[in-house]
Amino acid sequence: IIEHFGGMNMDLFGVPWAMNRFDELISLAKRDNIYLGLTAVSCMLADKKTGYDIAWEAVKRAASVIGYSKLIWGSDIPGTLRIYSYDELIEWIEKAPFISEAEKDLIFWKNGMAFFGENE
């Protein structure tokens, strides 16, 4: 699991090298055993003033290449809890108008179950 989309930041769509790095990261996630973690993406690619647009665009870009079955939710303890509560960390995925309920189920629990070899 490559957490935090590999450490992307707010410059993702404004800096060419950052986009190249992100595209390389997405390519890595095409491999069977590699997933991209979303837990702190809202902290890194969004803020309470500007909203979730950059974070959402990053998820759309990744999902268009690897699908929602390669995006996973993690715990991210304890770092991000200094900035956001768990409710706020989950909110940016819950409010994403382009992610279906079935895709949210993949992100929040089904992909984790598959990764760790658990059955439903």
Label every model-predicted segment.
Residues R61, V65-I72, L81-E120:
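Mid-to-C-terminal alpha-helical segments outside catalytic/metal-binding sites
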Residues S42-C43, I77-T80:
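Short Gly/Pro-enriched loop/turn and capping motifs at secondary-structure junctions
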Residues H4, L36, D76, K104, ...:
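Divalent metal-coordination and catalytic microenvironments
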Residues I1-I72:
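Catalytic pocket-lining loop regions of alpha/beta-barrel enzymes
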Residues N33-Y35, I77, L89:
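Bulky hydrophobic/aromatic packing residues
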